[in-house]
Structure formats: C-alpha cells, structure tokens
Swiss-Prot record:
Belongs to the WrbA family. GO terms for molecular function: FMN binding; oxidoreductase activity. One of its GO terms (biological process) is positive regulation of ferroptosis. This is Protein RFS1. It comes from Saccharomyces cerevisiae (strain ATCC 204508 / S288c) (Baker's yeast).
Length: 210
C-alpha cells in the first residue's frame, strides 16, 4: 500500500485544516497518510523586527495542531507527497523556500527525488485564482528540478465546486485551495474542504495502482 506524506507549513490552522481534509480523502480511498510540518524560521532570523518575532511566536503558540517536523530523510523515505503551501506574493513563504534551499541540494545532486509523485494545495489572501495558481506554478519549478512528477487536481473530480460562481472557492485545476483573507481570519468553507477531500481521494486513486 503506498503511503503519502502530506508536507505543510502552517502558522495558523488554515493549511493544517486543509491537510487534515486531504488526509481524510486519502483514507476514504483506502490509503494512509502522515502529516509533517516545515520548521518555522520566521522568528529566528536576525533581520526580523522585534514586533515580527513576537507576532510569529504568538501565531506559533496559538496554532491548534502538532505534527512531526519535516526533514530531508522524510522526502527520501516517502515516494508520494502532497504539499500544503500558504501563498506569499504568489510563491513559497520563506519557511518553505528555506527548507528546499537548505536541505535538498544534496538530494538534487544524487537524483534522490527523481520519479517521485506529488500534488499541491494552497491558501491565498484574496478571492480570484491568480495568486494561488501562480504559487503552484512557481512551486513546480522546484519539483521539476528534482524530477518530481506533478499530478494536478483537474476538473473531473471537482467540476461542480470549481465552476460554482456563487460560492467563493480558492481551488483551481492546478490544485485545491482556499481563500484565507488578508489577515488569515477566514476559515475554509465547506466547499473548499470538500475539494481538498476530493483531491486527496483522487490523488490516492491515481497512485495506488502504480
């Protein structure tokens, strides 16, 4: 049975909540998944303001989840990944970028991740697909350099939710997503949570026969 690693960065509960729904979708399909958290660096940098350091500590303290820390060994151990990314200016946040740059150069040189399979889910501040789609496309540059095969969400399994113009939904064909609001205060809607479950299920259905 293939086992999926759901790899996230989440200082609040939004990406973590989405990850739990991706996991639920995998379990509905008969699979197993474990969630790992990227180490937080935002309050450790010497360039952070005192206000920024305190805000990051508070956000980290208030987060209502606890997962194992993601390491380079995790990437080697698992063959299937779902990456959860909170969009920052249409790209990885610093924590994700720091993890890739600091931990995976040797893996890239050895081709250790080549041929592994991944999907992506994201959160973005505002309604509209631009920032979340751009985040996924930019993240794919890293995956491509490592030779990781990307599996998009597409429209087949979530057509109703992706084409509904009456309900705000941060998902797109590239991957499931949610609109979190400028201050991160908007929780995922039932429609958005459903799309994440559908993506988890579809992803596992795709890999289980490989």
């Amino acid at each position: 049975m293939p086992k999926v690693a759901i790899l996230i960065y989440s200082v609040d509960d939004i990406i973590a909540t989405l990850a739990e729904n991706e996991k639920k979708g995998i379990e509905i399909a008969g699979g197993e998944a474990e969630i790992f958290q990227v180490p937080d660096v935002s309050y450790k940098t010497e360039y952070a303001t005192e206000e920024g350091k305190e805000a990051a500590k508070v956000a980290k303290t208030n987060a209502d989840f606890s997962y194992k820390i993601l390491t380079r060994e995790t990437l080697v151990e698992y063959d299937y990944y779902l990456f959860g990314i909170p969009t920052k200016f249409g790209n990885f946040p610093a924590e994700w970028k720091s993890f890739w740059d600091s931990n995976t150069g040797g893996l890239w040189a050895k081709g250790s991740l080549h041929g592994k399979i991944a999907g992506l889910f994201v959160s973005g501040a505002i309604s509209g697909k631009g920032d979340t789609e751009m985040c996924i496309m930019n993240a794919m540059s890293t995956l491509v350099h490592h030779g990781v095969i990307y599996v998009p969400l597409g429209y087949k399994n979530a057509y109703k939710e992706l084409t509904d113009v009456e309900d705000v939904n941060g998902s797109c064909a590239w991957g499931a997503g949610c609109v979190s609001g400028i201050d991160g205060g908007r929780p995922p809607s039932l429609s958005e949570l459903r799309v994440h479950q559908l993506q988890g299920k579809a992803f596992y259905d795709r890999i289980k026969d490989l």
